[in-house]
Amino acid sequence: MGQKVHPIGLRVGIIRDWDAKWYAEKEYADYLHEDLAIRKFIQKELADASVSTIEIVRAVNKVIVSLHTAKPGMVIGKGGSNVDALRAQLNKLTGKQVHINIVEIKKPDLDAHLVGETIARQLEQRVAFRRAQKQAIQRAMRAGAKGIKTQVSGRLNGADIARAEGYSEGTVPLHTLRADIDYAWEEADTTYGKLGVKVWIYRGEVLPARKNTKGGK
């Protein structure tokens, strides 16, 4: 019935990297729950800071958290006050030494999570769902996307029967594994209930690095 595999999960290990990099045996469940707690806490604390990806790397009694954000100044704060407070709270939450790296997202209009978040917030402010999607598509294409597809589903305009409506521009080759496709889904809380927002952005092909050949072979 036209179900789609998760575009990022399909490409992990091929052109995408893992968001969590660590190995564990007996502690696996504890680390996994700790990761979930860290992500939930950061998303709550930095809800307005346009945080997209949260990468977690573990060493012995040390956790390295990389935050990909479109607003690094808001995350860092005046003289680093915000990031210091966040680090202290994460140290307390995990009981381990937490290091925080801030990675700036140069083009937020090419990040599916941030685009979906923008559409969802507009829907909560009663912006027409068609207009919100079309504006997001225009911004992404202007920023250099090769293709973009969006979908909003739920009780659109307060209709009694829920439905899904989407728009697309350019190409979004979901079956091409070397295609760099970013995907995200968000939720908008409206007076009529929740609306689901899905975004696929095709940013071009990622070609594997050429291997060095000896003897001209």
Swiss-Prot record:
GO CC terms: cytosolic small ribosomal subunit
Keyword Transmembrane (UniProt): no
Pfam families, A to Z: KH_2, Ribosomal_S3_C
Statement: the UniProt record of this protein carries the keyword Ribosomal protein: yes
Keywords: Ribonucleoprotein, Ribosomal protein, RNA-binding, rRNA-binding
Domain KH type-2, residue spans: 38-106
GO biological process: translation
InterPro entries noted in UniProt: KH_dom (IPR004087), KH_dom-like_a/b (IPR015946), KH_dom_type_2 (IPR004044), KH_sf_prok-type (IPR009019), Ribosomal_S3_C_sf (IPR036419), Ribosomal_uS3_bac-typ (IPR005704), Ribosomal_uS3_C (IPR001351), Ribosomal_uS3_CS (IPR018280)
Function: Binds the lower part of the 30S subunit head. Binds mRNA in the 70S ribosome, positioning it for translation.
Quaternary structure, from the entry: Part of the 30S ribosomal subunit. Forms a tight complex with proteins S10 and S14.
Record-stated family: Belongs to the universal ribosomal protein uS3 family.
Protein name: Small ribosomal subunit protein uS3
Protein's organism: Streptococcus thermophilus (strain ATCC BAA-250 / LMG 18311)
